[in-house]
Design a protein with these regions (language model features):
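N-terminal secretory signal peptides that target proteins for export/translocation
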Residues: 1-18
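Short N-terminal or domain-adjacent regulatory/targeting segments
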Residues: 41-73
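Short beta-strand segments enriched in small/hydrophobic residues
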Residues: 75-87
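Glycine-rich, charge-decorated loop segments at or immediately adjacent to ligand/cofactor-binding or catalytic sites
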Residues: 175-187
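Non-transmembrane, aqueous-exposed alpha-helical and coiled segments at domain scale
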Residues: 231-581
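Bacterial N-terminal signal peptides
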Residues: 15-33
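Short beta-strand elements in bilobed, periplasmic/extracellular small-molecule ligand-binding domains
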Residues: 105-118, 190-196
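A charged, well-structured terminal subsegment
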Residues: 195-226
Length: 581
């Protein structure tokens, strides 16, 4: 039986590419072991493979020493800087209230000045930093129960330390590792004070961090905190592990190098075959700052992870373009957010047909190799090439099923309108990939409903920064036959996705993100996304919720019925795939 099993295994894999042979062997081992009590291979006789290491290499970091500490807080001005607006609960309110009272008791002469960022927590605010440097002897930075806010709070605090102002950052216990990896990446050993989770719940038991905060501001610097120079990053060993298929699976999983699903071992032969899918050199840098930790990424490292995902060489240009788009920096907050965002990848142009992507029936579901592997690969890139790790810097409180694989092609053949890439400034024959962030809210199955129903539903999505309406071909063609262009459909959705100004104004996303923009601040490099007149409108005025430029229509799906889906998606970043062929 054992010999017969080995003969069958060798026969069914004869002449196939190594990647496919490995997958068939893995399936054969599992199925044979499940059906019989006899192992597929004799003990010690299983084939072994050398799997390349999929991990990227963090960049070298310039070490920035902390500013000298104060000797006493009496007669000193200390700024308490809040990342979130005054009327949006951060979770720290009772803690900060007790802290201020404690510091005033401990240092009767202290002058505590409370300041709230005018810009969103993720945006640089040079005017505020200059004021802190000019007026404060020290600062206390207060983030929120938010991974992205904590990361940005540590980032801006590092800048203040570099300007010569000593400080400390509070953080909740659940976000301790998130704060730690951020200060490690920055090379500035910001002093952190941990607060128990939900200590700001208002039950009268807020944590007292007075002594810890005071110590952070007055305790002398350690040698590590005074260190300068460069922290060099040693590249990982080329070979990740040598072992059987099962051993490779177990090892990669234990190292947090997978998404939990089985992978194709990235052997030298498999990776060399994958690299034939692009003319670009293996050592070429695709992006210098892959998220979440800003690592540089080479073409070869993309190929290694592409093999793991089950991709083919023909898909390699799409994956390289996806890395370029994701490494643009627009998604720094979304990728580590506690809000459980996901990322949607849309492929347009001839390459979608060339690699057999599904744009029709079940396009958003399982069953198509290219859709699944391209979608899956992005999550492996985030883990292995961007330094992501669940519970450390990937902090989605509940997670998102779209994080496994959310990739499809537009059904250009069945669409009555120009394809998506044309609306982004490309030609119809250009192949592109567009990456969106969001996926937290969606509505669907809009069978035979008009656009007003869809607009009404999407108006109530949280974080109203963008919307993608996915229209089945029957829906799109019916609208086109009624005389509507794609731009007109987008206009109708934007115009009718409204709330009263009072409803809009009371949402804390409006307070956190939209008010700063209305007051002229930038967000992700953009201004004027909503009219400044919103600031003065009465509560009963009806207003458009979304920025007009962030309402998009894409045609996807089969011909069986007229369906629509609305997805909360924003930050559309479109790049050329053709440049990576």
């Amino acid at each position: 039986m054992r010999g017969a099993g080995q003969s069958v295994a060798r026969f069914v894999t004869l002449g196939l590419p190594l990647g496919l042979r490995l997958l068939l062997l893995l399936c054969f081992v599992v199925v044979t072991s499940a059906k019989t009590s006899t192992p597929a291979f004799a003990a010690g006789d299983e084939p072994k493979y050398q799997a390349l290491n999929p991990r990227g290499n963090p960049p070298d970091v310039s070490l920035v020493p902390l500013s000298p500490r104060l000797t006493d807080l009496n007669d000193k001005t200390v700024f308490v800087v809040h990342a979130w607006p005054a009327n949006v609960p951060s979770g720290f309110e009772p803690v900060v209230e007790r802290l201020i009272a404690g510091l005033k008791t401990k240092y009767p002469g202290i002058n505590l000045v409370t300041r709230y960022k005018d810009a969103a927590y993720s945006e640089d605010e040079p005017e505020l930093w200059t004021q802190v440097k000019r007026e404060a002897a020290a600062f206390i930075y207060v983030p929120a129960d938010s991974a992205a806010t904590t990361m940005w709070s540590v980032t801006w605090s590092a800048g203040l330390e570099k300007m010569g102002v000593p400080g400390v950052v509070l953080h909740f216990a659940a976000l301790a590792e998130n704060a730690e990896v951020t200060r490690t990446k920055l090379g500035t050993p910001i002093r952190l004070v941990e607060v128990p989770n939900h200590s700001g719940s208002g039950d009268g038991n807020a944590a007292d961090v007075t002594d810890a905060v005071a110590a952070a501001l007055v305790s002398p610097l350690t040698d590590a905190e005074r260190a300068t120079g460069t922290r060099h990053s040693e590249p990982p060993p080329r070979i990740g592990v040598t072992g059987t298929l099962a051993e490779i699976q177990d090892f990669f999983y234990a190292q947090h190098w997978t998404d939990g699903l089985p992978i194709i071992p990235p052997t030298e032969e498999n990776v060399a075959a994958m690299l034939k899918g692009t003319k670009h050199a293996a050592s070429e840098i695709v992006t210098k700052a892959m998220l979440p930790e800003g690592w540089p990424v080479t073409v070869e490292k993309v190929a290694i992870n592409a093999v793991m995902a089950g991709a083919t060489p023909n898909e390699m240009p799409v994956l390289l373009a996806a890395i370029e788009a994701f490494g643009s920096g627009h998604f720094a907050s979304s990728v580590r957010s506690t809000n459980s965002f996901s990322f949607m990848q849309l492929v347009n142009g001839p390459i979608a047909r060339e690699i057999g992507m599904n744009s029709g029936t079940y396009a958003l579901g399982p069953g198509n190799r290219a859709n699944a592997t391209i979608g899956r690969a992005l999550r492996l890139f985030i883990y292995n090439l961007g330094g992501g790790e669940n519970g450390v810097n990937l902090m989605g409180t509940q997670g998102n099923v779209g994080s496994y694989a959310f990739c499809f092609a537009e059904n250009e053949a069945a669409s009555p309108w120009e394809p998506f890439q044309v609306s982004r400034g490309f030609e119809r024959d250009d192949s592109t990939i567009t990456v969106f962030a969001g996926g937290w809210s969606h509505t669907g199955n809009m069978l035979h409903q008009d656009l007003h129903r869809l607009a009404r539903d999407i108006a109530y999505f949280q974080w109203p920064s963008g919307i993608v309406a996915l229209l089945a071909p029957a829906t799109a063609n019916a609208l086109a036959q009624s005389g509507m262009s794609k731009a007109k459909v987008e206009e109708e959705l934007w115009r009718n996705a409204t709330l009263t100004m009072g409803e809009f104004r009371n949402d804390h996303y409006y307070q956190r993100f939209i008010i700063p923009i209305l007051k002229g601040k930038e967000m992700n490099g953009l201004r004027d996304r909503w009219p400044a007149s919103y600031l003065n409108l009465p509560d009963d005025a009806r207003v458009q919720v979304y920025p007009r430029d962030d309402v998009h229509v894409v045609v996807v799906g089969g011909e069986a019925n007229a369906m629509m889906q609305g997805w909360a998606m924003w930050g559309a970043t479109t790049v050329s795939i053709d440049k990576w062929r």
